[in-house]
Amino acid sequence: VSAEYLERQGPKDDXDCFDD
């Protein structure tokens, strides 16, 4: 998971859609 993704999505509340 990239930092940019974390900044956009925040904490994983949607499940493990992206485990990259």
From Swiss-Prot:
Disulfide bonds: none annotated. One of its GO terms (biological process) is cell division. Residues 1-20 are annotated as: Disordered. Keywords: Cell cycle, Cell division. It comes from the Eukaryota. Transmembrane segments: none annotated. Coiled coil: none annotated. On the 2D-gel the determined pI of this protein is: 4.8, its MW is: 21.5 kDa. Possible 'checkpoint' protein for cell division in the blooming process. This is Blooming-related protein 2.
